[in-house]
UniProtKB/Swiss-Prot annotation:
Listed cofactors: Mg(2+); Zn(2+)
Organism field: Homo sapiens
Keyword entries, A-Z: ANK repeat, Cytoplasm, Hydrolase, Magnesium, Metal-binding, NAD, NADP, Peroxisome, Repeat, Zinc
PROSITE patterns: ANK_REP_REGION, ANK_REPEAT, NUDIX, NUDIX_BOX
Motif (Nudix box): 355-376
InterPro entries assigned to the protein according to its UniProt record, in alphabetical order: Ankyrin_rpt, Ankyrin_rpt-contain_sf, NAD-cap_RNA_hydrolase_NudC, NADH_PPase-like_N, NudC-like_C, NUDIX_hydrolase-like_dom_sf, NUDIX_hydrolase_CS, NUDIX_hydrolase_dom
Binding site for substrate: 318, 354-356, 370, 374, 415
Source lineage: Eukaryota, Metazoa, Chordata, Craniata, Vertebrata
Protein name (Swiss-Prot/TrEMBL): NAD-capped RNA hydrolase NUDT12
Mutagenesis / variant outcome for changing residue 370 to Q: Loss of decapping activity towards NAD-capped RNAs
Length: 462
């Protein structure tokens, strides 16, 4: 009985595929209305109805099947998708239909379970306490409080020192220089020459406030240890270094900032991004007049009384963040990933493709556009994974998995230098053996590395 059922099903599948190949939409509709599960059924050679319609040049059938939710990412035994077939046979209209159809069915190898994770630059020591930014009296009192911590920047580079025991065989830690009021009070006396940002208060209540008992009136003590970022000019920075020989300004930012402890890196990401904004917006973007710093460093106020920016809330008055999509593009069969490289990269380094989101664009559309612009590969399903602040100067890297619906690579040399498909085995070797391989990927503190590892983890049996 089971063999009879199998034979009957095979006959129906064959009729369904033949109607797609012949362009018989009436017959196709009739079969599908009685047996909707046939939509993505494959023949012995792995072909679907969508592939047969694409091969034989029937755009109306392709459109119909797409509207029914047909999976564009299925790969036949020749490793082709429906889009690959349409491109090979020169059916441009069908290729455009397949390439521009948004979304698509989630492939079997992508899980719904995406755990929230904290990437490098996203952890912090501080509670930002944004409600205190308008309290000028509180901020002023905290500036001179003996427990307050100041971190110094010059040209956006943080002042650091090497921690650890000199007799230790371990690599010394790069730590932020945590300064106090007496270290920097001369700079605070010249507000026109500095940029001061309130970063927040320490999350953990520590005993160090007890060390200053009696120095601050009890009624003024709230138990909060404030942190500020202080930007000074290069001349002042050089003078400071001469007085503090154990400290130095950490540069260039990449890869130097990746040496910091994770929670200190989060503080630097916050401070560096806001300081970078101030360095670029000394004058009002609306009228060109001079501006002044307000709200603990989180606003610039135009000094021209009739400036339109003073009426209402305007994004030009507040620190900006630039959203960037970064995506691990997965081959339609799930066994390979697409990585690319720019000319400025170290020799042999490949990473996930990335690009800025344009105005009026969704995350998903930005992923599809950027991948096609840089590599020529078409993308269907897009799934968010995680994000990472990236203070170069102030980006938010939005990490996604993207399922390719085509496989041919056509690199735009104006965008990137190279792009290639890499097998899971190749990527695993790189992650375990590092630079001993023919190529390498970014370090573990970059979200690209985490996206690549995420793809490896969800495909253990491929």
């Amino acid at each position: 009985m089971s063999s009879v059922k199998r034979s009957l099903k095979q006959e129906i599948v064959t009729q369904f595929h033949c109607s797609a190949a012949e362009g018989d939409i009436a017959k196709l509709t009739g079969i599908l209305s009685h047996s909707p599960s046939l939509l993505n059924e494959t023949s012995e050679n792995g072909w679907t109805a969508l592939m047969y319609a694409a091969r034989n040049g029937h755009p109306e059938i392709v459109q119909f099947l797409l509207e029914k939710g047909c999976d564009r990412s299925i790969v036949n035994k020749s490793r082709q998708t429906a889009l690959d077939i349409a491109v090979f046979w020169g059916y441009k209209h069908i290729a455009n239909l397949l390439a521009t159809a948004k979304g698509g069915k989630k492939p079997w190898f992508l899980t719904n379970e995406v755990e929230e994770c904290e990437n490098y630059f996203s952890k912090t020591l501080l509670d930002r306490k944004s409600e205190k930014r308008n309290n000028s009296d509180w901020l002023l009192a905290k500036e001179s409080h003996p427990a307050t911590v100041f971190i110094l920047f010059s040209d956006l580079n943080p002042l650091v020192t090497l921690g650890g025991n000199k007799e230790s065989f371990q690599q010394p830690e790069v730590r932020l220089c945590q300064l106090n009021y007496t270290d920097i009070k001369d700079y605070l006396a010249q507000p026109e020459k500095i940029t001061l940002i309130f970063l927040g208060v320490e999350l953990e209540i520590k005993d160090k406030l007890l060390n200053y008992a009696g120095e601050v009136p009890r009624e003024e003590e709230d138990g909060l240890v404030a942190w500020f970022a202080l930007g000074i000019d290069p001349i002042a920075a050089e003078e400071f270094k001469q007085r503090h020989e154990n400290c130095y300004f950490l540069h260039p930012p990449m890869p130097a900032l990746l040496q910091l402890k994770e929670k200190e890196a989060g503080v630097v990401a916050q401070a560096r991004s806001v300081l970078a904004w101030h360095s670029r917006y000394k004058f009002c973007p609306t009228c060109g007049n001079a501006t002044k710093i307000e709200e603990g460093g989180y606003k610039r106020l135009c000094l021209k009384e009739d400036c339109p920016s003073l009426n209402g809330v305007h994004n030009t008055s507040y620190p900006r963040v630039d959203p960037v999509v970064i995506m691990q593009v997965i081959h339609p069969d799930g066994t390979k990933c697409l990585l690319g490289r720019q000319k400025r990269f170290p020799p042999g380094m490949f990473t996930c493709l990335a690009g800025f989101i344009e105005p009026g664009e969704t995350i998903e559309d930005a992923v599809r556009r950027e991948v096609e612009e840089e590599s020529g590969v078409k993308v269907g399903h897009v799934q968010y994974v995680a994000c990472q602040p990236w203070p170069m100067p102030s980006s938010l890297m939005i990490g996604c998995l993207a399922l390719a619906v085509s496989t041919e690579i056509k690199v735009d040399k104006n965008e990137i230098e190279d792009a290639r498909w890499f097998t899971r085995e190749q990527v695993l070797d790189v992650l375990t053996k590092g630079k001993q391989q023919a190529f390498f990927v970014p370090p573990s503190r970059a979200i690209a590395h985490q996206l690549i590892k995420h793809w490896i983890r969800i495909n253990p049996n491929l």
